[in-house]
UniProtKB/Swiss-Prot annotation:
Modified residues (Symmetric dimethylarginine): 118
Stored Pfam families: Complex1_49kDa (PF00346)
GO-annotated molecular function: 4 iron, 4 sulfur cluster binding; metal ion binding; NAD binding; NADH dehydrogenase (ubiquinone) activity; oxygen sensor activity; quinone binding; ubiquitin protein ligase binding
Stated family: Belongs to the complex I 49 kDa subunit family.
Main location: mitochondrion
GO biological process: aerobic respiration; cellular response to oxygen levels; gliogenesis; mitochondrial electron transport, NADH to ubiquinone; mitochondrial respiratory chain complex I assembly; neural precursor cell proliferation; neurogenesis; proton motive force-driven mitochondrial ATP synthesis
GO cellular component: mitochondrial inner membrane; mitochondrion; respiratory chain complex I
Known catalytic reactions: a ubiquinone + NADH + 5 H(+)(in) = a ubiquinol + NAD(+) + 4 H(+)(out)
Keyword annotations of the record: 4Fe-4S, Acetylation, Electron transport, Iron, Iron-sulfur, Membrane, Metal-binding, Methylation, Mitochondrion, Mitochondrion inner membrane, NAD, Oxidoreductase, Respiratory chain, Transit peptide, Translocase, Transport, Ubiquinone
Residue positions binding [4Fe-4S] cluster: 326, 332, 347
UniProt-recorded name of the protein: NADH dehydrogenase [ubiquinone] iron-sulfur protein 2, mitochondrial
Gene encoding the protein: Ndufs2
Amino acid sequence: MAALRALRCLRGVGAPVLRPGSGIRLPSQPSRGARQWQPDIEWAEQFSGAVMYPSKETAHWKPPPWNDVDILKEKAVTNMTLNFGPQHPAAHGVLRLVLELSGEMVRKCDPHIGLLHRGTEKLIEYKTYLQALPYFDRLDYVSMMCNEQAYSIAVEKLLNIQPPPRAQWIRVLFGEITRILNHIMAVTTHALDIGAMTPFFWMFEEREKMFEFYERVSGARMHAAYIRPGGVHQDLPLGLLDDIYEFSKNFSLRIDEVEEMLTNNRIWRNRTVDIGVVTAEDALNYGFSGVMLRGSGIQWDLRKTQPYDVYDQVEFDVPIGSRGDCYDRYLCRVEEMRQSLRIIEQCLNKMPPGEIKVDDAKVSPPKRAEMKTSMESLIHHFKLYTEGYQVPPGATYTAIEAPKGEFGVYLVSDGSSRPYRCKIKAPGFAHLAGLDKMSKGHMLADVVAIIGTQDIVFGEIDR
């Protein structure tokens, strides 16, 4: 009520009245904003007894903080999904991994394959048995002649033939050269992924020398198509065995230099010891083979357990690991290179004279000298390379100890000159399937070390 009395005083009740002749000049129109608006009596009486009742919105209203900044809501933290590859330099080809990361820790690793799929197994069905051979060079394109060896032995089983002893010794010789080629690539690129560049450049110089042996014996540095059903394509050139002997003497020093760089290196051990551990039970359950199986402590080598060609006539040891980690697998590969040198020296010492192809005109082409003088030999050669030879009906599974593991060929013949079905068992496929188990709980940088120790090549995985 005191406010109402003040309003009456302000609005004229009991206030002096200004007249025109009083000497005070009144403005004709007050300027805008000159006086502050004051509520009149009626307005004050109208709202004097108003009461604000709370509504649903106003009941929960809280005044904003003093600096008028909204409080941040807590958000549920989710794992990050990261695409690794296929263009990553450490992916070893066209590997694509979808990684689920919790910070730097790997929670899930999902490999995506098929980016190098060429339909090789189907293409083989449209080729003769000899024309299908070069496809095997392109599967594991780091260990070429070992793939040819598996296919050739499978065809020879179906044909029920056996190559001459000299051809078998040549196969073993170049199979072990191929094993060293593969292990050089595996060990040095693994080191390169982790950060050691020097072994890569040192050992690739030695690799070029072995490519020269390939070239001298077949004309090609990589995709040789040299080991064929019935033997090998041609005999060794003069002086090749002497050069291989000189190489094998000096190569052991190169292995020692690489071991000096890596084996006791503190950084290398920190990046490989207790990384990617695989127990013997897990290795068997996943179907691992080769170094991945032997690194876990299982002494299984098809050259010992199921000898082929002349592996039962050579002496060598099978190195195994004890912990099943990346470091053990590295040591196994280094020791396997030394054992391959032992086998190469035995092949050089025991190389017998004689033929290099089976003495069966239905399988082996005639010699070049005969083709220059005999029309029948020329026709025979032409028909053999265009139509091929008929293989009796049957099926066989043939496996060899390739550098990466058990490389198997399941071959089905229907009696024609073309395979009815050819199924290829690649060792790297099972190893890649175990990548999720091996990398779970490790850091993102350790995934690169695990991929390197698996020695993955996508030519054989995608096929």
